[in-house]
Amino acid sequence: MIVYPAIDLRGGLAVRLAQGDYARETRYAEEPLALARRYADAGARWLHLVDLDAARTGRFAHRELVARIAAGSGLRIQAGGGVRSLADVEALLAAGASRVVVGSAA
């Protein structure tokens, strides 16, 4: 079994939405890269990242953050959120993602 810890990104922060409701957001104090490193230290090999800003607006806001996490955590990245085109897939792969999750709107 492979466990995929997940970090949802919004406004550059690690967050969690209650039942997908943007009005009910929990913000975590830990910087996303530090949180990813903590998952790696706990034995994770993969990390699932979701760009909630891109999921909502269709414009990626966290490519640079995805790249920093991919380069600095030692984890393989599965990324998604707002992926609507082949260009979006290519951009996430170029940022260091090993896998890209494409939503139904693609």
Task: Tell where the protein language model's regions lie, with residue ranges.
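Conserved N-terminal beta1-alpha1 strand-loop-helix module at the mouth
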Residues: 1-75, 83-87
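Conserved phosphate/oxyanion-binding catalytic-loop motifs
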Residues: 79
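Glycine-rich phosphate-binding active-site loops on the catalytic face of alpha/beta enzymes
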Residues: 83, 90-106
